[in-house]
């Protein structure tokens, strides 16, 4: 049995984190993004706290982070979740370890609402969020087009 560890993400994790992000992008059902930004852009768009990686026997196998949904003071406790698990590590429960740790850390950091945008055809992510206590609060149709011109829809989940 492998050893699972969740720890804060460090800048030196970026090579592994960006590789995992690119794997998620390649699925075409994890994000609207079509490329991975450079670290400086990613770093500027995510909160300083609540950045985690999950390790499987010492190897970075996934990551999770938050970004604010709105800069206004009244929304200071609301953040959007990003969570990705590497292709060869999927289906092992690592996402559950990572998302539950992120939710705990977010609560300790003063966040009162976490939201997640999940593409409708991403059943594993929907299941993970529901298992971790998120609930579906809405759906947005024809929100974006993918690289093939197909309309995408998303579900919104909150915890």
Map each language-model feature to its residues.
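Acetyl-CoA-dependent GNAT
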Residues: 34-88, 99-100
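Conserved small/polar residues in nucleotide/adenosyl-binding loops
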Residues: 157-159
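Conserved GNAT acetyl-CoA-binding A-motif
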Residues: 106-118
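Amphipathic alpha-helical recognition patches that constitute DNA-binding helices
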Residues: 16, 80, 113, 124, ...
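Conserved GNAT-fold acetyl-CoA-binding loop/helix
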Residues: 14, 18-44
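Conserved catalytic-core motifs of GNAT/GCN5-like acyltransferases
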Residues: 65-68, 115-118, 130, 135-152
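A short beta-loop-alpha structural element at the N-terminal edge
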Residues: 4-17
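Conserved acetyl-CoA-binding loop-helix of GNAT-fold acetyltransferases
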Residues: 91-104, 127-131
